[in-house]
């Protein structure tokens, strides 16, 4: 019979000498595994007399329990030592500056577009959209443009190559085709705005070949210029966030409205900066008018029963005026410094109830 005291001392010495979890597990298998030294002693109990089995069985089980407790304690100590070593190697100096991560921002044009849409949505306007590539009917003919109107020429409009039947598709020069499509597909009353990109052959400090518009259309019975005036003045007061907006309407000509007007706002131009609601100067800000009867007829609406007004404004230009951006071309220069200066936080979603900007 193996000397249990000697075996105990030997196994406990091996447990104490284990330097890592892998070595400790090898000691465990050798001692109390299925073929381990202590497990082997338990298998010899069957050949002993009842008295001897009782005495030796208790001693062997006590040895096994003592070894397992020693292994458990050693394992906990080794795991704690490994954790301490890993934490020491991963020490973070909290006094170091955090790494710089460049933040993106909402483009001023998109912010302005969202502001305009939010205001008109609160006024009961629905948003309508249409394709950027249009045909001549929706972009010109249905809007009462004469056949020889200058806007139909190549120097003012981006045309595609003619089709086999001679038809030329084009990049829309305004979002008015959306109004036409709405009047054709819906019955009055109609109250929509049409935001989107538009395209013209123009490029200077206040014009770009690609720009953004929001046009509005109201069709119903008994509509007149007073409704148009109130709508636009209410919008401008909300957009510029001031009740001091003073406006004037100047007679103008648009093929698709009659009468037509350009709307000016009073402003202060001193100091190289335009301030709306102050000063004695005037600034043209949008075009508008009563929908021409020919446009209503082209869309299948009886002008003797229904009237309407329409308006259109450049979103990029509105943003320039509100946020003091001097050159429209800078908006599309991809200058990160400019975008960082004039951009908006992604969390600053326009909301008329809590403020637009």
UniProtKB/Swiss-Prot annotation:
Cofactor binding mode and count: Binds 2 magnesium ions per tetramer.
Keyword Transport: no
Annotated compartments: Cytoplasm
Main location: cytoplasm
Keywords: Aminoacyl-tRNA synthetase, ATP-binding, Cytoplasm, Ligase, Magnesium, Metal-binding, Nucleotide-binding, Protein biosynthesis
Highest taxon in the source lineage: Bacteria
Class of the enzyme per the UniProt entry, highest EC level: ligase
GO CC aspect terms: cytoplasm
GO biological process, alphabetically ordered: phenylalanyl-tRNA aminoacylation
Annotated PROSITE patterns: AA_TRNA_LIGASE_II
Enzyme Commission numbers on file: 6.1.1.20
Gene3D superfamilies documented for this protein: Bira Bifunctional Protein, Domain 2
One GO MF term: ATP binding
Subunit organization: Tetramer of two alpha and two beta subunits.
NCBIfam families named among the record's database cross-references: pheS
Protein name per UniProt: Phenylalanine--tRNA ligase alpha subunit
Gene it is expressed from: pheS
